[in-house]
A protein has these predicted regions:
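Active-site region of glycoside hydrolase catalytic domains
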Residues: 2-60, 103-104, 112-250
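Short, conserved clusters of charged catalytic residues that mark active-site
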Residues: 68, 75-78, 159-160, 217
Length: 250
């Protein structure tokens, strides 16, 4: 895509494929979220999907639930074959906090082993695993204590992140702390259409700040390690393109 105007905005009406030049070594990949593909989760989104609006209608259209989703938890080997057939070399997936730590302080080793097995299967297929530590979902115990509304709760996310890192560091070199914090904040605390369904701009700002603090603390906890230089740690951003009424694109 080319910038077509002096100001920084895109002309979405045309993508000039011939003008796109990806550098040598550019890594093509695909990504998923645990709740959206694994199935059988028990988190804030599971609760949200089972809830109702004030008028008694289902929170989700038609009362739909993710339920088993596409059963990636059990069919990941088939999915890896599809990824390989697509021709990409990187797969970013999130680890489901509610499965790994269903009760505060109690870690399920079988869930951790599942993600080890996933990483091993990816590497055997020549695909680089990239792990996202938080992709919109919280275990219910964390949600019930206010999740990222309270800065004091960040320590639980850091503890979880360190446990996962120690378990998967032999297989994963690229780590993402939080997926799209602006989406989590705007949809859950500004628009109120995602859990926890609040519409409070001031609280939204506080949550956004705490997510960035959480990212920083996890980054520091992982990079301060003696082997920290061997790992890349970043955050996943979402970009909202905004066009003013006076500069609408034709």
């Amino acid at each position: 895509m080319q910038v077509r105007h002096p100001e920084t905005r895109w002309d979405w009406s045309k993508i000039e494929v011939d003008a796109i030049d990806f550098p040598t070594g550019f890594q093509w990949g695909v990504a998923t979220s645990s709740h959206q593909v694994e199935g059988n989760c028990n988190n804030n989104w599971s609760r949200w999907e089972a809830s109702f609006k004030e008028d008694g209608t289902p929170r989700i259209h038609n009362g739909d639930r993710s339920a088993i989703a596409c059963d990636h938890w059990n069919r990941y080997k088939e999915d890896i074959a599809l990824i390989k057939a697509l021709g990409v070399s990187v797969y970013r997936f999130s680890v489901e906090w509610s499965k790994i730590e269903p009760v505060a302080g109690n870690f399920d080793e079988s869930a951790i082993q599942h993600y080890r097995d996933l990483c091993l299967a990816l590497k055997a297929a020549g695909i680089t695993p990239v792990v996202t530590l938080h992709h919109f979902t919280n275990p219910l115990w964390f949600e019930d204590m206010g999740a990222f509304e309270n800065e004091a709760n960040i320590r639980y996310f850091v503890r979880f992140s360190q446990r996962v890192f120690n378990s998967l560091k032999d297989y994963v070199a690229i780590w993402c702390t939080i997926n799209e914090p602006t989406v989590y904040t705007s949809q859950g605390y500004f628009n109120g259409v995602w859990p926890p369904g609040k519409r409070d701009p001031q609280l939204a700002g506080e949550v956004m700040k705490n997510l960035l603090v959480a990212h920083t603390r996890v980054y520091e906890a992982l990079k301060i390690r003696e082997d920290g230089k061997n790992y890349q740690v970043g955050i996943v951003k979402n970009v909202f393109p905004l066009v003013t009424a006076l500069h609408q694109l034709s």
